[in-house]
Amino acid sequence: MILMVLEIKNGIYWVGVIDWEIRDFHGYGTPYGSTYNSYLIKDKKNVLIDTAKDYMFNELIYGISKFIDPKDLDYIIVNHVEKDHSGCVDKLVEISNATIITNEKGKEHLSLYYDTKDWDFIIVDTGDEINIGDRTLKFIRTPMLHWPDNMLTYCKEEKILFSNDAFGQHIASSERFDYEIGEGIFEHAKDYFANILMPYKMLIPDAIKAVKNLDIELICPSHGVIWKEYINEIIEKYNEWAMNKTKNKAVIVYDTMYNSTKKMAHAIAEGLMEKGVEVKIYRVCETSLSRIMTEILDAKYVLVGSPTVNRNLYPEVGKFLAYMDCIRPLDKIGVAFGSYGWMECATEKIKEIFKNLGFKIVDDECLTVRFAPKEEHLKKCYEFGKRLADIGF
């Protein structure tokens, strides 16, 4: 077995697992794969921070064994109980009898996944510290980023923040640091934020305040690469994304049966572009939902088009709307459009989702058409796009 391990600072090691093949992460498209980052600290007490999925146990053990006997683990820090991070905890406890360090919610959630009645726990809260020898570990609770049990671990002496899901990216690569990839890493971080953290972004400013008070040389997330060169930049981007800062951008999402809705989408897009709006158009059946949500994160306008099928939405549009309702982007201008035969229902269903999300809905008589749009109707769609570009909150 040839697997990668890396010393990231003196006595601190990346011993995670690279998942080259994964393309779907509980509904979130991962075209570039992912990693499950686990970190080993060798000190008077040997500490493992987070683990990996249960079926990756052998790879994780291999990495740990390069530096210590896994039986010699003293502490396992569980920053987050989701099983891509805690999946190997039960087997590691069985091998090592290590004490679990987590918060009260973390203990509760672990007990719902595993038989923990014989496990030893140290329960921590924000501000608590544990000395492991030459180093001290400090803990910061970040509930609902993105589970109630989430927390951060900070190594004061080494100036390392072990951030778990915060600042993560789904990317499988041989590179372990941000500067090895370059500024392209921000797009991966944006994609992760949009699809994992967007529903809870109102909580992020408080977490950012806590992080900014720390002296940080490395941010070590549990997915993707380690932040070293771009620490200030990624913190600032998180702040921007959390504060709903938008660009003059429209995302148009549609599906079509006989190209009627497609023609409307493109006509509206032409009008928007005429007024200088950046436009992204996606036929939803040909694009991953996570890719679309990444573009919606900083868009001002969200336009959704669907033909009516048996008094309902076109199936892939319905799937997209359910996903968007789950991710919950805020402060958008919403437009529903589409074609129908004898009963128009799709646009009303789209607007119901918009209302649920608090979008400002813009309507116009040109946004629905029976059967197929003629040139005069497409001209109205084009003019509507131009008018839409002048609408704000």
Swiss-Prot record:
InterPro entries: Flavodoxin/NO_synth, Flavoprotein-like_sf, Metallo-B-lactamas, ODP_dom, RibonucZ/Hydroxyglut_hydro, Rubredoxin-O_OxRdtase. It comes from the Archaea. Residues 250-389 form the Flavodoxin-like domain. GO terms for molecular function: electron transfer activity; FMN binding; metal ion binding; oxidoreductase activity. Pfam families: Flavodoxin_1, ODP. This is Uncharacterized protein MJ0732. It comes from Methanocaldococcus jannaschii (strain ATCC 43067 / DSM 2661 / JAL-1 / JCM 10045 / NBRC 100440) (Methanococcus jannaschii).
